[in-house]
Regions:
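Alpha-helical transmembrane spans of integral membrane proteins, capturing the lipid-embedded, hydrophobic core
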Residues: 20, 24-28, 78-86, 116-128, ...
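Alpha-helical transmembrane segments and their membrane-interface junctions
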Residues: 126-146, 241-258
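Transmembrane helix-loop-helix hairpins at the membrane interface
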Residues: 153-347
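Juxtamembrane loop-helix boundary motifs flanking transmembrane segments in multi-pass membrane proteins
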Residues: 5-8, 108, 149-157, 161
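N-terminal, membrane-interfacial amphipathic/helix-forming hydrophobic leader that caps
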Residues: 1-117, 132, 136-140, 297-348
Length: 348
């Protein structure tokens, strides 16, 4: 009877989780459309869109920072950002396994084997809850997080929308990707020199794009096939921690309104972004960072521009993500405790 009840509960939870994943994923796509509307249909958006972006801040390998002369309109620049995010979503959608098959076989232990668009709503909502909880805990102890402000809400939205692209390219794609790739090349078996050089270059490029694909090619353990404990090497854990720490520290040291409490929350987010990069590839950390900046930013901007229903939409997406994240945390803890109790019960 207890086994049947447990299976029934698991089936109900699976349906609820699948519904929440679909609702959250739908809200992601709605935010993409909303961003276009706010920039190209709202008067404040059109006014900002006519301005010029003279130069573009860029960064690689965390420490190499420079500016690229641009000279395009804000409207054109936002469209380029939007298309890059659309491309990232397309890569996630067409990646294997498919979104539909992952949704049908949705179970908590297999989350890292799922399509990223099934994993993202779960991970992002849990991370959102963790960041909110950590920030509240710190501020209750007098450690402030701070925040950044902009003279124009539209230009502020443009700035935070661009940040995931440049920051993920700098901290995850080039730093983790190149260091991890060089580590794999160093460990490769000896081959004839010309072939070895060609293989090394291809392997490095593949590792930057999709670290798991490179590891599969070399016959190494992967997260998807072998789990987290075996699928991430000690070297990768080390690089992941170091880049996450640097990501957190830079947010505070760069100023702009952030206070010391930002270090821990940014480090936590950076760790999650680095992790999904190792599992899914270059598009994954961009979309997780997009969730915090563009996704919430669109609904917040809609509220600031007094769009009809903007206040409610902004509240609703925060409530939905907090609720989903809390439910997942509680369910995960409950499943773990039930498993622990069951194993002890069988032993006795």
């Amino acid at each position: 009877m207890s086994t049947t009840l447990a299976l029934d509960i698991a089936a109900v939870l699976k349906k609820i989780l699948a519904a929440l994943v679909v609702v959250l994923a739908t809200s992601y796509f709605l935010s993409m459309g909303l961003g276009l509307f706010l920039i190209y249909a709202m008067p404040q958006g059109l006014d900002a869109a006519s301005r010029q972006v003279a130069e573009l801040p860029f960064s690689v390998l965390m420490i190499v920072n420079f500016r690229i002369p641009l000279g395009v309109s804000v409207g054109f620049f936002f469209l380029m950002i939007w298309l890059l995010y659309t491309g990232a979503f397309a890569l996630a959608w067409f990646d294997r396994p498919s979104f539909a098959s992952s949704l049908r076989s949705l179970t908590r232990p297999d989350v890292w084997r799922s399509n990223y668009l099934v994993t993202l709503p779960q991970l992002a909502s849990i991370l959102f809850v963790a960041v909110v909880f950590l920030q509240a805990l710190q501020e209750s102890a007098g450690v402030q997080t701070g925040g950044i402000s902009f003279e124009s809400p539209v230009l502020g939205f443009l700035s935070i929308s661009y940040a995931p692209l440049v920051e993920e390219f700098s901290y995850r794609i080039t730093t983790i990707g190149i260091l991890d790739g060089l580590n794999h090349i160093w460990k490769m078996h000896r081959v004839p020199s010309d072939k070895g050089r060609r293989n090394a270059i291809r392997l490095l490029i593949l590792n930057i794009w999709k670290p798991e694909r490179a590891k599969e090619l070399l016959g190494y353990y992967t997260i998807r096939n072998d789990g987290v404990r075996r699928g991430i090497s000690r070297f990768e854990w080390t690089v992941l921690v170091l880049t996450s720490g640097a990501f957190g520290a830079v947010h505070y040291l760069s100023g702009g309104g952030w206070e010391i409490g930002k270090i821990s929350t940014a480090m936590l987010s950076g760790f999650a972004m680095g992790f999904v990069y190792l599992r899914y590839g270059a598009y994954a950390p961009i979309l997780l960072h997009w969730f915090f900046n563009y996704y919430f930013g669109t609904f917040d901007l809609a509220s600031q521009l007094n769009l009809a229903g903007g206040d409610f939409a902004s509240f609703a997406v925060e409530f939905l993500n907090l609720g989903t994240g809390t439910l997942l945390v509680v369910a995960t803890v409950a499943i773990y405790l039930m498993g622990t109790w069951s194993s002890k019960h069988h032993r006795t």
